[in-house]
Amino acid sequence: MCSSDLIRFDQAFSNETGLSLFESSQLALARWSVDNQLVERGDWSNDWDDWVNLIFSMRVQPKLGAKRPVLVTHFPASQAALAKLAADDERTAERYELFYHGVELANGYHELLNPSELANRAQIANRQRIEDGKFPLPIENPLFQAMKIGFPDCCGCALGFDRVVMLACQATSLREVIPFPADRA
């Protein structure tokens, strides 16, 4: 039987960077990224989450699950997507991802049930979309309507089967295991 490790997002981040995630400003993350040669200039983005994602994907993720699978929990609340905020730390969300050999194999979360919170998150996302030159998305979508009626408490997990196959076959890219990659479709 294979066991796995469990680590909070902020702890994994700190272990690899020495930075305290929730005490680091966008400017501090930008400086760290320049100093560690992830980007050439600190004006790559004005968004805290962009810097967190860059550092996580380039420095933290490649080292996750080196010996055995690891579940990364308590993602920043700003990256909650459709997850509930954690009752024990509202800076974080009840969201997790499973990594093995630096590859994300699965992700899941405890589903948000509050339609007001969903609308608030959609408004925040739409402001960012408009800033990025994209069209805003409708706030009162089918999920919002379902929450208003009464959505049952639930959670879910999505497994990237293609990624599991890639690791099992010791392939170096998904292209090697997907029968119809986009460029051959």
Regions found by a protein language model. Give the residues of each.
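A translation/RNA-centric and nucleic-acid-associated enzymatic feature enriched
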Residues: 7-185
